């Protein structure tokens, strides 16, 4: 419900807020990649691989810092290697309203954030989940799970940039609802009769 009700921001205003040029004629990705506790020693290499593929394909990308889990320093170190790439925008954190609106206008979310599982289906946004984080979680069909592999990453990014494939995957069914749960809850509560039976406890 919060996602649905989040105030919309124009691309022009978003550009000003993050100090990075965005326009409707140019596709951009949002990248958020966290460390997996069981693979924290690989975090640098995994993040470097993701960003290097995006760089080689010259994908305009907004990169957001990871959480503070073990291995986060490796991810941040990898991000710092790309600080001078002109079509990359690196942010340590973003207010929720700006983050949601970046997703609303993005071509794809790439990395392994839970936002790729929960938020993107409602927004009709393709999500590329790289590696084992989030693996086996219940998810909508807009999410593509791939290993941290250069060839597969490049192939999948290319698929997302194909308009025909993009339209096919972006509007898949959303298993998490349409953002109107509060109205449904109110409707159910209104249908419940308030009487003594409701307040009587039964010990089974």
What are these regions (language model features)?
Residues 1-204:
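Nucleotide-activated sugar donor-binding and catalytic core shared by glycosyltransferases
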């Amino acid at each position: 419900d919060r996602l649905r009700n989040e105030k919309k921001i124009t691309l022009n205003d978003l550009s000003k807020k993050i100090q990075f040029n965005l326009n409707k004629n140019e596709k951009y990705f949002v990248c958020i990649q966290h460390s997996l506790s069981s693979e924290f020693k690989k975090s640098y290499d995994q993040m470097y691989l993701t960003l290097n593929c995006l760089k080689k394909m010259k994908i305009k990308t907004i990169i957001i810092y990871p959480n503070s889990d073990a291995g986060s320093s490796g991810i941040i170190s990898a991000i710092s290697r790309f600080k001078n790439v002109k079509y990359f925008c690196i942010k340590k954190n973003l207010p929720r309203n700006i983050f949601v609106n970046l997703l609303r206008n993005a071509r794809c979310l790439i990395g392994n954030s839970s936002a790729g599982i929960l938020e993107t289906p409602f927004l009709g946004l393709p999500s590329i989940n790289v590696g084992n984080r989030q693996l086996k979680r219940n998810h909508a069909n807009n999410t593509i799970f791939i290993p941290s592999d250069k060839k597969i990453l490049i192939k999948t990014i290319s698929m997302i940039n194909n308009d025909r494939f993009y339209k096919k995957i972006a509007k898949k069914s959303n298993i998490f609802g349409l953002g109107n749960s509060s109205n449904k809850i109110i409707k159910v509560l209104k249908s419940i009769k308030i009487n003594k039976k409701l307040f009587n406890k039964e010990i089974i």
